[in-house]
Design a protein with these regions (language model features):
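Noncatalytic scaffold domains of N-terminal-nucleophile
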Residues: 33-85, 89, 97-98, 102-280, ...
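Bacterial N-terminal signal peptides that target proteins for export
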Residues: 2-15
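Extended C-terminal subregions enriched in glycine
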Residues: 384, 448, 496, 532, ...
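Active-site rim segments in enzyme catalytic domains, especially the processed small/beta chain
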Residues: 110-114, 121-138, 153, 159-160, ...
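Short beta-strand scaffold segments in enzyme catalytic cores
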Residues: 116, 121-128, 440-444, 504-506, ...
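Short, small/polar residue-rich loop motifs at catalytic or cofactor-binding pockets
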Residues: 317, 436-439, 500-502
């Protein structure tokens, strides 16, 4: 009898479900296309759900979008799920954090092509558990041998008197902004030195996706638009640029149109290049047919890069810039990276908060108080003024390391406190490193305790906008951050690295390597260092966990315009008061707030330390915890 009752109920529910669905379809005329339902802030005809309100969490801080992800055998976090899963697959197959990082970056080369490519720049901080050391790799590009100041001046490009910082006088896109690719060299370099696998294994996920295709997500579709990169007269260099590169349109658009969310995208030419790297290593990129095709494209557009420029390229290993902040040591990339501005910004906050507002701390003020935001904005403005004044290629600027050491000292920070008024914004106006940089960042960690903090970029959206035909990769535009001021440490010169907005960080608890360890990044042009400082404050001063630190509202300050973009909920709280202080504040969404990724290792003294044996299945002696940015398609995965 009970069986008959259950059967009857099941049939009734099934009938009700069919009736309800049919009734819904009938009441609305025809069923909606569920695959097309999305919101557009600029559209006046959004679906009704776009006017809904967000649901609440069950616990913790109600504004936190998700919990931290936790695992013990390994973890990868980045801005795109397929890329993160590719890195995790490498970890499961026995690879280490470095192997996983390269695999993840390579997939991002395909799925976020506007942000990253093998012909762009790459930096990494590698923590090796066996010796408890940090290793910094700079694989950023250098100017071609013909890229002289005289060459730029001869084609009509002169220093901009309204901008005495990075990018002054340089075009923003086109062939004159390209520098010799560094990323492909860096991928192999870090594998050879600290990885356990070769290109054959770690590039396989990227090559396969490029051949078979992947579905473009909403967030990535929003960013997927090519810049104007050439003139109608292809060899004309003056006044660039008036139209898109046809090779880029053929490679990155679908039937000549910008891809839409849900469309399947393939890049067989890029797959071919991945296969060449698998077979020949980086020599397959910097020498031979790939290099020749790159040089041919550059010369067809009037550029100067040569086969020798490519064949002779080398990155370099360097030492991080390290400072202490309230019990934690922050390691940042050295010049030409902007990383050290985060060190200086935190020093200023540490030295000046009590002097500007006696008896107060950042925690006692908190993000509901306009004085909290005022302090952060002023600290950023002071740090970036120093950054833009001195930053450049250390190989062309003897003594730069000593200058950075001085600027990141507490003594210097204390000298700057007098420049911060408690109720009036300072006027800025030096430098204009774009806040619109398009970059990928990722963190990776393995069961042996190795960790990687990684940043890889084309600089602007689709870099220079120029694609190498037949090989499917974009050329970056980092050279647009050179200056044409002959007196600047950042003036353009052959074989020189430009000022670089890329930043990756690593955090040590009290400077020790036996305490908590964190790989930290926040991409997005000049948002990177100011973003690092903001999330450090969120965690160290305000007590946020890794996920909450990302989900909290951020600001972006533009140094030359003096404008402050503040995310909308924070603007509602403090916007009017900041404007009254003289800040040029405007509300904004998360589009130019960068994208954060972080992994924290928290040791457990009850657990045995991990084995150094390659075939070990023992997890780390603690827990990996990860946070990822909801402003991107961020995901953290572990096992």
């Amino acid at each position: 009898m009970r069986k008959n009752i259950r059967t009857g109920i099941s049939r009734a529910l099934a009938a009700l479900a069919v009736f309800s669905i049919a009734g819904l379809a009938a009441s609305q005329g025809s069923a909606a296309d569920l695959a097309s339902q999305s919101c557009d802030a600029k559209s006046g005809s959004n679906p009704a759900f776009c006017h809904g309100v967000r649901g609440d969490r069950a616990e913790g801080w109600m504004a936190q979008g998700r919990s931290e992800v936790m695992a013990r055998n390994g973890m990868v976090t980045t801005s795109q799920p397929l890329a993160a899963e590719a890195g995790l697959e490498i970890l499961r197959k026995g690879g280490n954090a470095v192997d996983a990082a390269v695999a993840t970056a390579a997939v991002l080369n395909l799925v976020e092509p506007m942000n990253v490519g093998m012909a762009g720049d790459m930096f990494a901080i590698v923590y090796t558990a066996k010796d408890h050391k940090l290793h910094v790799l700079n694989a950023s590009g250098v100017a071609a041998s013909g890229q002289t100041l005289a060459f730029m001046n001869a084609h009509g490009y002169k220093v901009d008197p309204k901008n005495d910082g990075p990018g002054s006088g340089m075009p923003y896109a086109g062939i004159l902004t390209d520098t010799v690719p560094g990323a492909a060299w860096g991928w192999q370099e870090v594998l050879d030195k600290y990885g356990t696998m070769k290109f054959k294994q770690v590039l396989e996920p990227a090559a396969s996706y490029a051949e078979k295709g992947f579905a473009i997500s909403e967030r990535i579709a929003f960013d997927w638009h090519l810049p104007k990169a050439v003139n109608a007269n292809r060899s004309q260099l003056e006044n660039c640029c008036t139209e898109m590169d046809p090779d880029s349109v053929a490679t990155w658009y679908i039937d000549g149109k910008q891809p839409k969310a849900g469309q399947i995208f393939k890049n067989p030419d890029l797959a071919k290049t991945f296969r060449i790297l698998q077979a020949k290593g980086r020599d397959g990129f910097y020498k031979g047919p790939v290099a020749q095709a790159l040089v041919n494209k550059v010369h067809a557009l009037g550029g100067t890069m040569t086969m020798e420029d490519l064949a002779s390229y080398k990155g370099e290993w360097a030492e991080p810039v390290m400072t202490d902040y309230h019990g934690y040591t922050l390691a940042e990339l050295p010049p030409p990276s902007q990383g050290f501005a985060a060190n200086e910004m935190l020093n200023i906050l540490s030295a000046c908060t009590d002097k500007v507002y006696p008896g107060q701390t950042l925690a006692s003020l908190g993000p509901v108080d306009p004085r909290y935001w005022h302090l952060l904005i002023e600290a950023k403005a002071l740090a970036y003024a120093d950054l833009n004044r001195v930053n450049g290629d250390p190989n062309f600027n003897p003594g730069l390391a000593d200058k950075v050491k001085s600027l990141t000292s507490m003594a210097h920070a204390q000298e700057l406190c007098a420049k911060i008024s408690p109720d009036k914004a300072m006027v800025t106006g030096t430098g204009n490193a774009s806040g619109d940089g398009d970059t990928i960042v990722l963190s990776a960690a393995d069961r042996w305790g190795n960790m990687v903090s990684w940043v890889n970029s084309n600089y602007a959206n689709f870099g220079s906008g120029i694609t190498v035909p037949g090989y499917g990769f974009i050329l970056h535009n980092r050279g647009s951050l050179f200056t044409l001021d002959p007196n600047s440490p950042n003036v353009i010169a052959p074989h020189k690295r430009p000022y670089n907005t890329l930043a990756a960080a690593f955090v040590l608890q009290g400077g020790r390597t036996d305490g908590q360890l964190m790989a930290l990044q926040l991409m997005g042009g000049d948002m990177q260092s100011q973003g690092h400082a903001q999330v450090m404050v969120n965690m160290v001063d305000l007590g946020a966990n890794l996920q909450a630190a990302s989900d909290m509202a951020r600001f972006h300050h533009n140094q030359v315009r003096g404008t402050v973009d503040l995310e909308s909920e924070a603007f509602k709280l403090v916007g009017a008061q900041l404007i009254a202080m003289g800040h040029k504040v405007r509300p904004t969404d998360g589009g130019n707030m960068g994208g954060y990724q972080a992994i924290l290792m928290t040791p457990d003294p009850k657990e045995p330390k991990p084995s150094g044996a390659k075939n070990s299945t023992q997890p780390i002696n603690g827990t990996y915890r990860a946070g990822t940015d909801h402003r991107k398609d961020g995901i953290a995965v572990g096992w």
